[in-house]
Amino acid sequence: MSKQRGTFSEVSLAQDPKWQQRKPKGNKSSISGTEQEIFQVELNLQNASLNHQGIDKIYDCQGLLPPPEKLTAEVLGIICIVLMATVLKTIVLIPFLEQNNSSPNARTQKARHCGHCPEEWITYSNSCYYIGKERRTWEESLQACASKNSSSLLCIDNEEEMKFLASILPSSWIGVFRNSSHHPWVTINGLAFKHEIKDSDHAERNCAMLHVRGLISDQCGSSRIIRRGFIMLTRLVLNS
């Protein structure tokens, strides 16, 4: 501390004009050393100021926020992410799940929407189907169907109907036949049958049957058990 006081005293005296007139010529080197020390102190102060300004500039350029503001920004970012996820879930996921859930309901409603079929009849689209579980030949099934509400042995109309019936029935006669293996397949109404029937090599398999594998030919006089036995189908067309 005494050394610093001495230095500043010398600096003050050195700056005083009177002192400069009085000072002996032999102290020239001492004054020069003092001036160098003063210059060094000023230089150090300038460097410290520049370093402080440089740190501030680097801090600003990096975009760093003070801790409270940075925390607030992170919280807002998380909230934005959660809101975006919720919106995406609402837009994409919920309609997809609703569509999947509505598909079985739509099929059920289509199968039961008329609601005017007699008891023990199955409703699908605009038709009613009766399932006769007795083992019968094709001719016996034809006669049994004719005795129920003026219906007849079913003739498959389209692929959708065939797939629906095949999915719930093991096997059943349908109202399609031919006179021989050399004749075309026709319905009991005398119309040409347009769907494919898997034929067999047996010459006497001239009656058509609905099977899980599709439409196949079988012996008209057969009542043998296949899976759960033959099931007779009839259809009563309803007014929509």
From Swiss-Prot:
GO BP, one annotated term = positive regulation of natural killer cell mediated cytotoxicity
Transmembrane helix in keyword set: yes
The superkingdom listed in its UniProt entry is Eukaryota
Quick one: where is this thing mainly located? Answer: membrane
Membrane topology per record = Single-pass type II membrane protein
Extracellular topological intervals: 94-240
Q: Which SMART domains match?
A: CLECT (SM00034)
Q: Where is this region: Disordered?
A: 1-31
List S-S links within the chain.
117-128, 207-220
**Function field:** Plays a role as a receptor for the recognition of MHC class I HLA-E molecules by NK cells and some cytotoxic T-cells.
What name does UniProt use for this protein?
Answer: NKG2-E type II integral membrane protein
Q: Which gene encodes it?
A: KLRC3
